[in-house]
Amino acid sequence: MIRGLICFILFAPLVFTTVCFGVQLESGVQKAGHQVVGKGFTSPDGRVTDLNFVPESADPLNGPSQSHARRLPVGLKAEWIADSETGMASTELNVSLPLLFVRTPPPIVKIGLNYTSLQTPESYGIPEDLFEYSVGIASVRRLNESWNVRTMLGVELATDNENRSSDAWRFRGGLFATYSKSENVSWTLGAIAMGRQDLPVIPVIGAVWQPNPSVRVDLVYPQPRVNRLLFDDGSRQQWVYLAGGTSGSTWGYQQFDTIDDQLTYSDLRLVLGLESRPAGASGKPFVRGKTMQLEMGYVFSRELEFEQETREESLGDALMINFSTRF
């Protein structure tokens, strides 16, 4: 766990410095009149990362963006869950690659790497270091003025780098539709294959309501979120939000370095967050550009599930802090 904490401490300043530099750079470009800010779709955040699988630049509502045409979107994330006995720290890096030669808007290939340091009692026989190597493709289609359809497909190797059997391979996918009743209300319905042992498939259902430019209510299962605008200087917006949801992952590993097994971690969480992002048009909550999020929250209903022994271990409640950025 000390290794994971050190990794988190080193990584968090990198995230913050990168974002600060990106904010300064973006503000300067906007003042010079060279940036075009598009509109996009951002799914609920958290370790149910499958909902984040559709990159913002894949949205057909997005206009051309000169800054995004010059570089590939990169995402960074660092999270630490503080518990005296079973804490964990994780860091994540992902890159999105648009397939420009296919069609407009292009499908997006997303490549990711996640490292998790997990602290558990020695009697569990769980390695401290767990890794997730992922690749996937996502696409968005506008059927008409009211309907958009999103599809995604991906594969992931989640392992301690010792067990690379079928226990470690996870396949993900999803299909859901969005119906915009008006500029301020949209409805979402579909399902996502998580690749997790405890949650193979979950529904995605709910609505997003924005009664005015300063308030946005995302009542979308499995991660609802209520947002309030704090400040808007014309180029960037600062939001505060309250969110809930589930998080977790499944890995293949070698128990006591000899027996192939499968481990699933899951939790529920309630978080308070701050978000800094480029300003968009009134009534359009999702935009492309450099973003930063800082979350602090309470994590409960934490469980470890072991496939071979068909047993579960309940973990103590914990506090969580999370830094993330996309630029």
Spell out what each predicted region is:
Residues 1-69:
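Cleavable N-terminal export/targeting peptides
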Residues 204-208, 272-274, 313-327:
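Outer-membrane beta-barrel "beta-signal"
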Residues 74-78, 109-113, 151-153, 187-189, ...:
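Membrane-embedded beta-strand positions of outer-membrane beta-barrel proteins
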Residues 78-84, 113-119, 155-161, 191-197, ...:
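Transmembrane beta-strands of outer-membrane beta-barrel pores
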Residues 97-101, 139-141, 179, 193, ...:
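Residue-level signature of outer-membrane beta-barrel architecture
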Residues 125, 236-305, 311:
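Outer membrane beta-barrel transmembrane domains
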Residues 60-71, 99-108, 142-148, 183-184, ...:
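Short loop/turn motifs that connect adjacent beta-strands in outer-membrane beta-barrel proteins
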